[in-house]
A protein has these predicted regions:
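Boundary/entry segment of secreted carbohydrate-active catalytic domains
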Residues: 1-20, 197-209
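Active-site-proximal helices and loops of the catalytic beta/alpha 8
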Residues: 2-6, 25-32, 52-59, 66, ...
Length: 340
C-alpha cells in the first residue's frame, strides 16, 4: 500500500444487520469510495464466529471465511466466501487495498469440553490468584468438523490455551488460568493493564505452543494469497505475545511478493508505552494513535478547548511514520463500551 497521504476506510460498523449481505453492499459502493480518494478498506474479521450473528471478534475458525457449514451457518454475518472473493477482485481492479482484521488473541465456540486444572484469577489484577487449584470442564476442543481438514489439519485442545472464562460443570463465569503443564501468562505483553494484559476474554491462546505458532503463521500467508490482501490490522496486539506477533509479521511478509501494511490496535493514552512497543517491533508496524483520539475526545467535552495542544503527547507527534490517526471506530460507537 502506498502510504503517501493514504486513507484507510473502516468498511463496517458494529451494528450492521446479520443478513449475510455486507460483502455485496460493500462491493456496490467500491467505485464511489475509490472516486473520493480512499486508498484501502479495513475489513471486519471475516472468519467464522462462534454464532451466525457474531462480528468475528468472537472468532471460532481462522480458515472458514464463510465457506463451511459450522456454528449454525455456512456464511459469516458479513456474507459468503464467494462474495468476499468477488469483493476482493473488484477492489484490486479499482486499485483499492484490503486490510484484514486479524483476531489472533483468543477463540470462541469450542466443539467439545476438556477437564483441566485451573486457578481463579482476580478480575482487576491478573497476577493475583484467588483460589486453590481445582478442575473445570472447559470448551477447549476445536475440531472444526465442518471444514474436514481443508486448508489446515490443525485441531485445538487445552495445550493451545492458557485460560478460559467458563466452567461448564459448575456453570461459573470467572478468569480461570490453566496450570496443567506448568502453564502461565505470557510475559511479553503490556504490563500496565491489570498487571499483565495476556488475558482479555474467552479462551486465551498460548503462543508458547509450537503447533499453534506454526498454524497461525501458515494462516497469515494463506489468507494473503486467498484474498490478495494489502495488509492486516492486528486486533488487541498488546494482549498476546509480542515475540509471536513480531515473528508472525516477519513470516507473513516473507511469504508475500509485495510489501504489506500492518497496524496494531493498542488502546493506551500513554505515548511512551506505544513508542516502546514500536521500538521492539518490526520497522513496518504502525499503531493507531489512541492518545490523539483521547485528546480529541477531551477537547470535544471542554467548554474552553485549546486546539494548540491537540497533538501534544500523541503518536503522530512522536512517531509520525508509525502513526495511523483516527477519530472513531467500532469500539467508540454509542452501542459499545468506550472511554471516548
Amino acid at each position: 500500500m502506498d502510504e503517501q497521504n493514504s486513507t484507510v476506510f473502516q468498511a463496517f460498523e458494529w451494528d450492521i444487520p446479520a443478513d449475510q449481505q455486507h460483502w455485496q453492499r460493500l462491493r456496490r459502493v467500491l467505485p464511489q469510495l475509490s472516486s473520493i480518494g480512499v486508498s484501502s478498506l479495513w475489513l471486519p474479521p471475516a472468519c467464522k464466529a462462534g454464532n451466525p450473528r457474531g462480528n468475528g471478534y468472537d472468532i471460532y475458525d481462522l480458515y472458514d471465511l464463510g465457506e463451511f457449514e459450522q456454528k449454525g451457518s455456512r456464511s459469516t454475518k458479513w456474507g459468503s466466501k464467494k462474495d468476499l472473493q468477488a469483493l476482493a477482485s473488484d477492489a484490486r481492479r479499482l486499485g483499492l487495498g484490503l486490510i484484514f482484521d486479524a483476531v489472533l488473541n483468543h477463540r470462541c465456540g469450542g466443539d467439545g469440553m476438556e477437564r483441566v486444572k485451573v486457578v481463579e484469577i482476580d478480575q482487576d489484577d491478573r497476577r493475583k490468584v484467588v483460589s486453590k487449584p481445582y478442575d473445570v470442564d472447559a470448551w477447549l476442543k476445536f475440531d472444526f468438523p465442518g471444514r474436514h481438514g481443508a486448508y489446515s489439519g490443525m485441531r485445538y485442545g487445552w495445550r493451545q490455551f492458557n485460560a478460559t472464562d467458563w466452567d461448564h460443570r459448575t456453570r461459573k463465569n470467572a478468569i480461570f488460568k490453566i496450570i496443567d503443564g506448568g502453564k502461565d501468562w505470557a510475559h511479553d505483553v503490556d504490563k500496565t493493564e491489570h498487571g499483565n494484559a495476556d488475558y482479555l476474554l474467552m479462551n486465551n491462546l498460548d503462543y508458547t505452543d509450537k503447533k499453534l505458532q506454526d498454524d497461525v503463521k501458515q494462516w497469515g500467508a494463506w489468507i494473503v494469497r486467498e484474498l490478495g490482501l494489502a495488509g492486516f490490522r492486528l486486533d488487541a496486539i498488546q494482549h498476546f505475545s509480542h515475540k509471536f506477533s513480531n515473528e508472525w509479521m516477519t513470516h507473513v511478509q516473507s511469504k508475500s511478493n509485495k510489501p504489506l501494511f500492518f497496524v496494531g490496535e493498542f488502546w493506551s493514552g500513554n505515548v511512551q508505552l506505544l513508542t516502546h512497543w514500536l521500538d521492539a517491533s518490526p520497522a513496518g508496524l504502525h499503531l493507531y494513535d489512541a492518545p490523539l483520539l483521547y485528546n480529541l475526545a477531551r477537547t470535544s467535552w471542554s467548554k474552553k478547548p485549546d486546539l494548540s495542544s491537540i497533538f501534544d503527547q500523541t503518536l503522530v507527534q512522536a512517531r509520525p511514520q508509525n502513526a495511523v490517526t483516527l477519530v472513531m471506530n467500532h469500539d467508540t460507537q454509542y452501542s459499545t463500551h468506550s472511554l471516548t
